[in-house]
Design a protein with these regions (language model features):
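Donor-nucleotide binding loops and adjacent catalytic segments primarily
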Residues: 195-300
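Nucleotide-activated sugar donor-binding and catalytic core shared by glycosyltransferases
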Residues: 2-34, 39-51, 107, 142-143, ...
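Short, charged, surface-exposed secondary-structure boundary motifs
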Residues: 60-67, 134-143, 215-218, 296-298, ...
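Conserved nucleotide-sugar donor-interacting segment of glycosyltransferase catalytic cores
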Residues: 86-151, 192
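A short helix->loop->beta-strand "cap" motif at the edges of active sites that frequently abuts
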Residues: 49, 121-124, 264, 319
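Conserved nucleotide-sugar phosphate-binding/catalytic loop shared by glycosyltransferases and other
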Residues: 33-78
Length: 400
């Protein structure tokens, strides 16, 4: 039995695709271990996947929210978050190295966690990339300015990896691109959502989204009664973006007031801390942790931060979106959904207000039929792709 280790860091939306891939690999006879933050142990093990804790035992979603709360500029916020993750990876390299021992293949996320340790052990890697901007355009003709700027950025990005490479006696790299697999990079996005970049090399492959239907989920009676009592509700699912303690109640107030102005019923996911002491109107209900595969089918449209996970789920399950992006990659996904006419114009975090939310809801209500039709048409195509099966097939080929 071939053994595969995969490593990733981040919020639940960053972890979930790897759980789906791991389950697909296990079903096809592989022995798989997933390494990530200790806080994700229960989530991974409930999915039947062997888990290895990597790094400090922290609530990564709240830690990331704290960084965002201190840095309102999206670019600076992303840079600070990356530095935070890099420190964890550097400090955890010996843990990662031990997990890599004896494996036949290492699956490496966009953080390149495990790539250097695999190289030190002579183990091949496969990359997974969630953001298209992270994929090098090696086939694009380079101007002098491109080369100069690319060299400066590459050198800066390589610094944290070179610190790890030094631990294992590996030669420094000039760019983080040199760490990437030259055989296979899996992009778990649908070709119906993202057009393949002609400047990518052949080993960068769009597989289709990775997901599963959560057929075992049963909603509680209170939620069922709410859904049966009126029209389909708006779903508010900000995930980790609802954790900023200093502004959480004010943010929730904005949404509730806007929903009432627009005459909307709503299901609210997230805001756990504030909702403990918050009396919601009868037209709204808090749902806690509910799988998107079930939840998104119950709503008319979804308001979300447009991270990889929720952007993917909105397309898979054919539900229009109001994006509220906080950081750069979310802004990219929000623009993509808007360009496909399955989402309204995004409300950027710095512009969030009751009026902005209300106006976005009105925009959605006016154009809903068209956006819903588009979302359902794309969903129908996506659900025929079999992204996990394609990723497993490509990994099979890579190991032969």
């Amino acid at each position: 039995m071939k053994k595969i280790a995969m490593f990733t860091m981040g919020t639940r939306g960053d972890i979930q695709p790897y759980i789906f891939l791991a389950r697909g690999l296990v079903k096809n006879g592989y022995d798989v271990v997933l390494g990530s933050h200790p806080c994700w142990k229960d989530l991974v093990e409930r999915a039947g996947i062997h888990f290895e804790p990597i790094g400090p035992d922290i609530d990564i979603e709240k830690e990331a929210a704290a960084i965002r709360g201190k840095n309102q500029n999206p670019a600076l916020s992303m840079l600070k978050t990356m530095n935070f993750v890099f420190r964890i990876i550097q400090d955890s390299t010996h843990e990662i190295y031990e997990v890599c021992k004896g494996q036949d293949l290492i699956v490496v996320s966009h953080s390149q966690m495990g790539a250097t340790e695999a190289e030190a052990l002579g183990i091949p890697i496969v990359n997974v990339t969630l953001q298209k901007e992270m994929i090098p355009e090696k086939l694009k003709p380079q101007t002098f300015k491109d080369k100069l700027l690319g060299g400066m950025i590459g050198k800066q990005m390589a610094k944290p990896y070179n610190k790890i490479r030094k631990v294992y006696g590996l030669t420094p790299v000039k760019s983080s691109d040199e760490i990437l697999s030259q055989k296979l990079n899996l992009i778990p996005i649908s070709k119906y959502v993202l057009e393949r970049n002609p400047y990518w090399e052949d080993h960068h492959i769009l597989t289709g989204y990775w997901y599963e239907e959560d057929t075992d989920y049963t909603p509680d009676e209170k939620l069922v009664q709410f859904l049966e009592s009126g029209e389909k509700p708006v779903i508010l699912a900000l995930g980790a973006m609802s954790f900023e303690d200093t502004s959480e109640k004010d943010k929730l107030d904005m949404f509730i007031n806007a929903f009432q102005r627009a005459g909307c019923r709503a299901i609210i996911q997230g805001f756990q801390k504030t909702l403990k002491d918050y009396e919601l109107p009868d037209t709204m209900i808090a749902c806690g942790s509910v799988p998107h595969s079930w939840l998104f089918g119950q709503g008319c449209f979804v308001i979300h931060h447009c991270g990889f996970g929720t952007a993917a789920a909105s397309m898979i399950y054919g539900i229009p979106s109001i994006p509220v992006p906080h950081v750069l990659d979310q802004m990219g996904f929000a623009k993509q959904l808007c360009d496909m006419n399955v989402a309204t114009k995004p409300i950027h975090a710095g512009d969030l207000s009751e009026t902005a939310i209300y106006e976005a809801i009105r925009e959605m209500q006016i154009s809903f039929d068209e956006k819903k039709k588009n979302a359902e048409a794309i969903s129908e195509k996506i659900r025929k792709e079999g992204g996990v099966a394609e990723a497993v097939r490509l990994i099979d080929m890579n190991l032969k």
